[in-house]
A protein has these predicted regions:
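Sec-dependent signal peptide recognition
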Residues: 2-8
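Primary mode marks residue(s) on the alpha4-beta5-alpha5 output face of response regulator receiver
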Residues: 19-45, 53-176
């Protein structure tokens, strides 16, 4: 009986809050938000080997940009957009309907998989076009796989770029 009550309580909490409890509190959207789009990303995180600003004898891999295709399903069959940095180096998502949104990071949380890039909460800084993403205010990146920066660069790697494959799910929210 106790197990059934616990299940009902968890289910009720999910329905009422509208948010997945596996998402850390630090990257949850405000309760006043409404989900407008969910997409699956497959692409790369690009890193470049640079001199460590804290230790000039050391070289590190520095994040340069994301490049990913966005799909309607988790099998990556129907291409619906792309993800990249805009000219101002803001993460941007653009759909095949011509709408796009750029954002800045608000908060991050470690992914459950230590080899995966962090989960993020981002806030829109601008939108373009008319369509799916026009009303977007918040973006979540969750369920990441891969994409993590390599351990350490080295002098022979200075200036070189590497691409690390990743997948993620992106959720876009507007105000209710």
């Amino acid at each position: 009986m106790r197990g059934i009550f616990s299940f009902i309580l968890v289910f009720y909490t999910l329905v009422v809050s509208g948010q997945d409890n596996s998402i850390p509190l630090s990257i949850r959207v405000p309760i006043s938000s409404r989900l407008i789009w969910h997409t699956y990303a497959r692409g790369v995180q690009v890193y470049v080997c640079t001199q460590d600003p804290k230790d000039s004898s050391n070289f590190i891999w520095t994040f340069k940009e994301p490049r990913a295709d966005l799909y309607a399903d988790s099998s990556y069959h129907q291409l619906v957009g792309r993800h990249y940095f805009d000219a101002s180096r803001n993460p941007t998502w653009e759909t095949t309907d011509g709408s796009k949104v750029s954002a800045t990071k608000v908060q991050q949380a470690n992914a459950p998989d230590s080899a995966a890039i962090p989960w993020l909460l981002l806030h829109a800084t601008g939108t373009g076009g008319t369509g799916t993403l026009t009303p977007a205010i918040f973006i979540q990146r969750i369920r990441t796989n891969g994409g993590k920066v390599p351990a350490k660069g080295g002098r022979p790697n200075k200036g070189q770029s590497i691409e690390v494959a990743y997948t993620a799910e992106y959720f876009f929210y507007s105000e209710k």
